[in-house]
Amino acid sequence: MPGRQRRDGGNGPAGQNSNGPEGRDNRRGGGDRRGGGDRRDNAAEKNQLERVVAINRVSKVVKGGRRFSFTALVIVGDGNGLVGVGYGKAKEVPAAIQKGVEEARKGFFRVPMIGSTITHPVQGEAAAGVVMLRPASPGTGVIAGGAARAVLECAGIHDILAKSLGSDNAINVVHATVAALKQLQRPEEVAARRGLPLEDVAPAGMLRARAQAAGGAR
């Protein structure tokens, strides 16, 4: 029958190429490549630092009464200069934290550093929050409050002086700290913009710390 001949023809050499062992192996190989990428991404995410700064319960008044949900402010970083802040909202606390983590990863940014501290003093503002950051010598540690400390530690900054000059609200402090970190510049960028050699822009102590950090990296 014509229909049977068409089905039999699908099992010929052409059919074997698409549905036989070789075709299955090719498809399986492509899946392995994709799976390998996923595994690498998952491994990188597992090595990231996560800090939950604040969890709040909020309510919404509707016709049937009140609907309660939770918000979570989360900091995520790789401990090596990469950090992000996320704000999640859900009916359950774990779901709110997970949403905050995902949002923080989408907003990753790189923090310029020299060794274990920042490149220069800076001040950031967000709403009523004002945070001042100053570089510190090795061994000083992170001198900062809870909300700012979470951001700095996730970014991988080990020596720094931080002071909150405005609101003590955790959300304002976190966003002010992030605003300060985003203002940091590398000495090379400043020297290139001014058209001057690096020695005329960066202090001698910064150059020594930079050289020591480069030597330790080797």
From Swiss-Prot:
The disulfide bridges present are: none
**What Pfam families has UniProt attached to this entry?**
Ribosomal_S5, Ribosomal_S5_C
* Protein's GO biological process: translation
Q: Looking at the record, which segments are called Disordered? A: 1-45
- Keywords linked to the UniProt accession: Ribonucleoprotein, Ribosomal protein, RNA-binding, rRNA-binding
Please tell me whether the keyword Transport is annotated for this protein. Answer: no
- Database matches in InterPro entries: Ribosomal_Su5_D2-typ_SF, Ribosomal_uS5, Ribosomal_uS5_bac-type, Ribosomal_uS5_C, Ribosomal_uS5_N, Ribosomal_uS5_N_CS, Ribsml_uS5_D2-typ_fold_subgr
Domains: entry comment? The N-terminal domain interacts with the head of the 30S subunit; the C-terminal domain interacts with the body and contacts protein S4. The interaction surface between S4 and S5 is involved in control of translational fidelity.
Relate the protein's function as given in its record.
With S4 and S12 plays an important role in translational accuracy. Located at the back of the 30S subunit body where it stabilizes the conformation of the head with respect to the body.
This chain's protein is named: Small ribosomal subunit protein uS5
Gene that codes for this?
rpsE
